[in-house]
Amino acid sequence: MKFLILDVYPSNDWRLVKDTAGGYGTGNDFGNSLFSQTVNKFVSKMISMPPMYAIYIYTILKQKGFVVEYERDLNNRKAIDEADYIIMPSSIIAHESEVKVLKDLSKRNKKIFVVGVFSSVLKNNYKEKNSYIVPGEPEGFFLNLTYSTQNLDSFFEGEKNELNPSNFVEDLDALPFPDWNYYSKKYPLKNNFLGFNSKIAIPILASRGCPYSCFNYCTYPLQQGRKVRLRSVKNVVDEINHCMQAMDTNKFVFRDPVFSINRKFTVEL
């Protein structure tokens, strides 16, 4: 069984990051002049990362023994054609491009799991004959999924397609450490400016969820829920040590929306 995580972007020439803004994504396009295009290209290489859940999904599927790839190149027809199931991250910044590719894949009878909070907000845009919109945190969905062809195919049938279960991961320690080593060999994994400290920058989450009242307009509670869930300090430290040994970097970017909400936890970490 082969899975392809197909991460669609309208351009590689300026910074587009789907993980920011609570999974909606953000981008910087400084203009069309020669200078602006140079800045666009530079920034796109200096600040670059995928949606974290995409690499969690990759790692979960890999550990379960499946053939899985992460790909941004739509010209890689071989990977697309050979995939039994395609997993497509969604975002506001690449919405039009994602939907266009989704429609094309559905017409070719490819089965597509659409992941990410934005597809749950704009369901009608991502709803196709051969698509299933995964609600909640997709890591929970793929961690607990029954991997038989019969069960997987059932998600693309009418009745099951309308199910809307919660997939929030209560025990964050149950998640594997994302395989950033695989990703960084194919694409930039950076978070620096003006070339300072250009080591690989590992995104990491010590907690998920945000309880504050700004949930009325903020995207993070949509993505992670309002309940704050903490990993154990040991689990976070073990991931840091794992990445330092596997990737020879000591640069980490904590992506928690409320990293310091629990002072005791933060100080211990």
Model-derived segments and their meaning:
Residues 6-8, 88-89, 115, 255:
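Short hydrophobic segments within beta-strands
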Residues 10-12, 119, 209, 258-259:
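Short, glycine/serine-rich, charged loops/turns that create anion-binding
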Residues 15-16, 151-203:
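N-terminal [4Fe-4S]-dependent radical SAM core
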Residues 26-55:
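Aromatic- and Gly/Pro-rich amphipathic surface segment
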Residues 53-171:
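Glycine-rich beta-alpha loop elements in corrinoid/cobalamin-binding modules
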